[in-house]
Amino acid sequence: MTPEHLPTEQYEAQLAEKVVRLQSMMAPFSDLVPEVFRSPVSHYRMRAEFRIWHDGDDLYHIIFDQQTKSRIRVDSFPAASELINQLMTAMIAGVRNNPVLRHKLFQIDYLTTLSNQAVVSLLYHKKLDDEWRQEAEALRDALRAQNLNVHLIGRATKTKIALDQDYIDERLPVAGKEMIYRQVENSFTQPNAAMNIQMLEWALDVTKGSKGDLLELYCGNGNFSLALARNFDRVLATEIAKPSVAAAQYNIAANHIDNVQIIRMAAEEFTQAMNGVREFNRLQGIDLKSYQCETIFVDPPRSGLDSETEKMVQAYPRILYISCNPETLCKNLETLSQTHKVERLALFDQFPYTHHMECSVLLTAK
């Protein structure tokens, strides 16, 4: 695979290899055949980041080869959304001959939605001033004249200039209902929107008929919490990043959901609060004991669950675990399988043509 060519003819083979690999990794814990969810074969990534290479009067997007570290020119990127590809061409055309906008520009980040909105961030090794803002506003207006629904942001050391806003609102059809998700620049969002829809619908399916409340750790902008709220009496969710918490609160209101409570704290801190080890001012007014959480949902970072959180989640009858790293999932399962068994197993091809796998398990108490 090269940045400008996807081996789409190999899609089925690479997916089949992942299924075999996941089954092998999960063999000590389950003999289930994974439920498999396919990605679009191209234009599946909703965000992308590129370094900018200055070559005389020219400049262009590049990425670095992971093995050789050599730079690769990228003029089109079929893994990314069609809107990102349009913007890549338009941004280079708009910046190349503009001394103010191109000077010390070293990176451009793109974030897009299925609803055809975009945030483009330009990163600089220089101070950004009023002249930069004026030129950036002219570029934004020129892009919009091309029917590109785009918001521009300038970033430099300790500086962020959002010309209009630093977010876009995604609209996803999830099990017959449209979900609105505010996505903030430089915050985590699911990269493959089509797969995100399938993950949300799978999570809804495995939790249908649930009793009691749901606890979610690492909730981000409320991606899963809000979609799953319809299956539970109440949802209690934790997140540490301020922009994500703010987006989650907006999303609760935008989706007219009244049974989700977001707490800004780390999973490790919440574990301490639940165990009565520490009290937190952030929990004032929230009666943790009133929640009857029968199900816990975790979508941890690549490092997986720490040992204290492992112990904490074992107290719940059902564990829904989405993993971007099956190796750490299996490491966690060495502990979790002592008290729980695997009821459902799914593979989501979030990152086609790479070795990365996204998978999920539903665990129930033995």
Swiss-Prot record:
Its EC number is 2.1.1.-, 2.1.1.35. S-adenosyl-L-methionine binds at residues 190, 218, 223, 239, 299. GO terms for molecular function: rRNA binding; tRNA (uracil(54)-C5)-methyltransferase activity, S-adenosyl methionine-dependent; tRNA binding. The active site is at 324 (nucleophile), 358 (proton acceptor). One of its GO terms (biological process) is tRNA methylation. GO terms for cellular component: cytosol. It comes from the Bacteria. HAMAP family: RNA_methyltr_TrmA. Belongs to the class I-like SAM-binding methyltransferase superfamily. RNA M5U methyltransferase family. TrmA subfamily. This is tRNA/tmRNA (uracil-C(5))-methyltransferase. It comes from Escherichia coli O157:H7 (strain EC4115 / EHEC).
